[in-house]
Amino acid sequence: MTKALYVGSFDPITNGHLDIIKRAAKIFDELTVVVAINTNKSALFTPQERVNLITQVTRDLENVACKSVTGLTAETFTQEKADVLVRGVRNGEDLNFEIQVAGMNQYLNQEVETVFIPANSKWEFTSSSLIKEVVKMGGSIKGLVPETVEVLLKSRLK
């Protein structure tokens, strides 16, 4: 059995993230979505809130689980007995950054193998940060995030 980890801040989960989750769940026997604490970002939702949202929107995917962690992804990889790390990439800028991250993860833990899944063109422009900004400015995010996330975002940011 092949176990994959999909690590991110997911603050909040978007339909782009969800698309990567669904596609990775078809490729790997087990997929654990890992909510990580990104010290470079100011989070709107607590790690537990993000886990709850992800669990709710992936409940129909039998081979998907979700948890939050602190610490390095390379350490989580070993703790979870993972075989591969999944990363979604929207564009060349993402890929350049993700290649650096993959290199560092492999430096820290030679067992870490990273697989890049290109974003569906439908989601190339979406990011959690951009979606939060649109909500703050009163714009519509309909269709960019799951409905439960949209409702929670609007109540949190207005």
Swiss-Prot record:
Reversibly transfers an adenylyl group from ATP to 4'-phosphopantetheine, yielding dephospho-CoA (dPCoA) and pyrophosphate. GO terms for cellular component: cytoplasm. Gene3D superfamilies: HUPs. CDD domains: PPAT. The gene is coaD. This is Phosphopantetheine adenylyltransferase. SUPFAM superfamilies: Nucleotidylyl transferase. The lineage of its organism: Bacteria, Bacillati, Bacillota, Bacilli, Lactobacillales. Substrate binds at S9, K41, T73, R87. It is found in: Cytoplasm. ATP binds at S9, F10, H17, G88, V89, R90, E98, W123, E124, F125, T126, S127, S128, S129.
